[in-house]
Amino acid sequence: MSIENLKNALPEYAKDLKLNLGSLANEDVLNQQQKAGTFIASALASRSNLVTSAILAEFGPQLSAEALAAAKAAAAIMGMNNVYYRFVHLVGGDYANLPARLRMNVMAKPGVDKVDFELWSLAVSAINGCGMCMESHEKIVRQNGLTQEQVQAAIRIAATVHAVAATLDGEAALS
């Protein structure tokens, strides 16, 4: 399966998603590794077998083995961190002063350019709705030279991939 197959699988009422998916696959404000990794990390965060398979088939070959592992790691570690830090942020109190005591070594040595890993972490954090994580990752990527347009492109990819996954999974449940 490919991006084209995903587009063709979308129902007529999701035509905007189809158009967005096509234009984002050709987005040129991000470099190839940034774009491919954002698509893959977002697909994994969206938890759809169909979407993840199609996006991995389309974008996996564009990444080195190390970059592919890092995109997967961004989705995995943010799956944990987004829950933990969203709790800390929303509940408040003294939780922020306690050590997390969760291993996060991959964040220090992701195996790719740190800014790319942070961008993928930002996209996943947007999908998972962790404000504290989004603020932190956005600050890091901006301090390391990414533009607002590049950040926005990654979030547009995350939003569209997530919506495609929800739509296709919903349609599958209805059939």
Swiss-Prot record:
Keywords in alphabetical order: Antioxidant, Disulfide bond, Oxidoreductase, Peroxidase, Redox-active center
GO biological process: cell redox homeostasis; response to oxidative stress
Family: Belongs to the AhpD family.
Highest taxon, organism lineage: Bacteria
Protein name (database record): Alkyl hydroperoxide reductase AhpD
InterPro entries xref list: AhpD, AhpD-like, AhpD_core, CMD-like
SUPFAM superfamilies in the record: AhpD-like
Alphabetized Pfam families for the sequence: CMD
Disulfide links within the chain: 130-133
Main EC class the enzyme belongs to: oxidoreductase
Catalytic residues as annotated in Swiss-Prot or TrEMBL: 130 (proton donor), 133 (cysteine sulfenic acid (-soh) intermediate)
GO MF entries: alkyl hydroperoxide reductase activity; disulfide oxidoreductase activity; hydroperoxide reductase activity; peroxiredoxin activity
Enzyme Commission (EC) number: 1.11.1.28
Function, as annotated: Antioxidant protein with alkyl hydroperoxidase activity. Required for the reduction of the AhpC active site cysteine residues and for the regeneration of the AhpC enzyme activity.
Aminoacyl-tRNA synthetase in keyword set: no
Biological classification of the source: Bacteria, Pseudomonadati, Pseudomonadota, Alphaproteobacteria, Acetobacterales
Organism: Granulibacter bethesdensis (strain ATCC BAA-1260 / CGDNIH1)
Catalytic activity: N(6)-[(R)-dihydrolipoyl]-L-lysyl-[lipoyl-carrier protein] + a hydroperoxide = N(6)-[(R)-lipoyl]-L-lysyl-[lipoyl-carrier protein] + an alcohol + H2O
Residues annotated as signal peptide: none
